[in-house]
Amino acid sequence: MDEKSILTINVVTPDGSVYENTTDLVICKTTVGEIGIMPNHLPLLASLAIDEVRVKVDDENFDEIAVSGGFVEFSDNTLSVVASAAERKETIDVSRAERAKQRAEKRIEEAKNENNDIDLRRAEVSLRRAINRLNISKH
């Protein structure tokens, strides 16, 4: 790729770097909708939804990273994704994600039975994270 037509993407969590690459397109879902970021995009700061970040590798393939919310910042052709948790598609432990989904579903039922709104919301977030990881692992 021509130097002017690439951007650098870094995905980091509190545990360290999860992904770094150069590309000409990144697609991610913010809390207000999906966005595509290309080289020379206007500076941007947005909060991420629990979803995937897709990084174009070539004309037909994308790297996929599951993110559990966080922020995306773009300036000077550098895209930084800061997330509390992130996993590349190839490192997702499907059986672990299935167990997390089952635990979250059980916690949702318990919270509903106890009319505990705080635990219910926490369990729903855990369920969305587990489902996101499972969906990305199956692409």
UniProtKB/Swiss-Prot annotation:
The keyword Manganese does not apply. Pfam families: ATP-synt_DE, ATP-synt_DE_N. GO terms for molecular function: ATP binding; proton-transporting ATP synthase activity, rotational mechanism. One of its GO terms (cellular component) is plasma membrane. Gene3D superfamilies: ATP synthase delta/epsilon subunit, C-terminal domain, F0F1 ATP synthase delta/epsilon subunit, N-terminal. It is a peripheral membrane protein. SUPFAM superfamilies: Epsilon subunit of F1F0-ATP synthase C-terminal domain, Epsilon subunit of F1F0-ATP synthase N-terminal domain. PANTHER family: ATP SYNTHASE DELTA/EPSILON CHAIN (PTHR13822), ATP SYNTHASE EPSILON CHAIN, CHLOROPLASTIC (PTHR13822:SF10). This is ATP synthase epsilon chain. It comes from Ligilactobacillus salivarius (strain UCC118). The gene is atpC.
